[in-house]
C-alpha cells in the first residue's frame, strides 16, 4: 500500500494503526482527518506541489491506510463545513485560518458526536 520506505508518512500511518490495533484489541478505534486550512495547497510558503505533498495528499493517505485496516474515518476535511478560504467562515470560525475558535469547536463537537454514535 503506497510507499513504505522507512521515512514516509505512509509508513508512519501503518505503524501507528497496527500499534493501536494491537494495543487495544476489540476496542473501537476511529481516525480523523485534519481540517482545511488557509494556504493548504502551499508548502513552506510556496504554492506549488513539492516532494512532500499538499495537505490533500496527507488526507488521502490517511483515508487509504485507515481503509486498509478497516478503521472508520471521520473525514473532517470533507464534512466539517469549516473552509477558511471563504472569508465569512474564516472570520466566524477559524480567525487564524487554521485553528477553530469556540464557535468552530462547537461545530466540530456536533460532527464528532454524530460520527461516534454511528460507530
Language-model features, listed with the residues they occupy:
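Alpha-helical cap/lid subdomain in secreted, periplasmic
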Residues: 1-119
Amino acid at each position: 500500500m503506497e510507499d513504505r520506505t522507512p521515512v514516509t508518512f505512509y509508513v508512519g500511518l501503518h505503524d501507528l494503526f497496527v500499534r493501536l490495533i494491537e494495543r487495544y484489541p476489540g476496542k473501537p478505534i476511529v481516525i480523523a482527518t485534519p481540517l482545511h486550512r488557509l494556504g493548504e495547497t502551499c508548502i513552506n510558503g510556496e504554492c506549488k506541489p513539492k516532494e512532500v505533498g499538499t495537505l490533500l495528499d496527507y488526507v488521502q493517505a490517511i483515508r487509504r491506510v485507515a481503509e486498509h485496516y478497516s478503521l472508520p474515518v471521520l473525514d473532517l476535511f470533507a464534512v466539517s463545513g469549516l473552509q477558511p478560504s471563504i472569508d465569512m467562515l474564516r472570520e466566524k470560525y477559524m480567525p487564524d485560518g487554521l485553528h477553530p475558535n469556540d464557535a468552530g469547536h462547537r461545530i466540530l463537537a456536533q460532527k464528532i458526536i454524530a460520527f461516534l454514535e454511528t460507530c
